[in-house]
Amino acid sequence: MLLNLRFFIYNIFSSFFRTTVPSKFKQCGHDVELNGPLYINPTQISLGNHTRLQSTTRMIVDGGYLNVGKYSAIGAGCTIIPANHIPTVGLPQFLSYLHINDNTRTISIAEDCWIGAGSWLLYKSEIGRGAVIGACSVVTKYIPPYAVVSGNPAKIIATRFTIEQILEHEAILYPPQERMSREE
């Protein structure tokens, strides 16, 4: 009985969250799935078509932005930090929460990416098209298209597809003008 009540409340919350929150995003494509609770400021996030954010995803620091391309998914418990603290002479560390002199930027996740559960995307992270980030990885830099990365810091451990498979995959998902070429 208690379990049924829990699922009932969860389903009501989820449907409310999915129908009311998308309008608050900087940009929100169609067929976007938001599985709350999410700890984000939607005005700092752009979501492409057919994207998914799983529960307990959080974005720390106001001022930075997150762009998520179409067909991408962010797993449960991911943390996105689009800022970098800059040490300031004369400012004690305990006041760093004031974010004086912080650098912020946009973290970009290209199309068709999968960010594994519990991963961290830090300042200067940029995820190339089709990349897969293993669970609990810490990304601190550019990840090339169709790379599979894992670890802390995230390192390339494989490629998602062969070049021929990438070209076939691109032909299925994208119109000719959006496809990657063999050289890319």
Task: Label each PLM-derived region with a short phrase.
Residues 38-47, 52-126, 152, 160-161:
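Flexible, glycine/small-residue-enriched loop-and-beta-strand segment within the central core
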Residues 1-24, 29-30, 71, 78, ...:
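Terminal amphipathic alpha-helical/low-complexity segments used for targeting or macromolecular assembly
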Residues 40-41, 79, 132, 138, ...:
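A generic "structured core" feature
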Residues 66, 137, 145-147, 155:
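Glycine-centered loop/turn positions within well-structured domains
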Residues 114-116, 130-136:
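Short amphipathic alpha-helical surface patches that serve as generic macromolecular interface elements
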Residues 34:
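Conserved short histidine dyad/triad with adjacent acidic residue
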Residues 125, 136-137, 143, 152:
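Short beta-to-alpha loop/turn elements within the nucleotide-binding domains of ABC transporters
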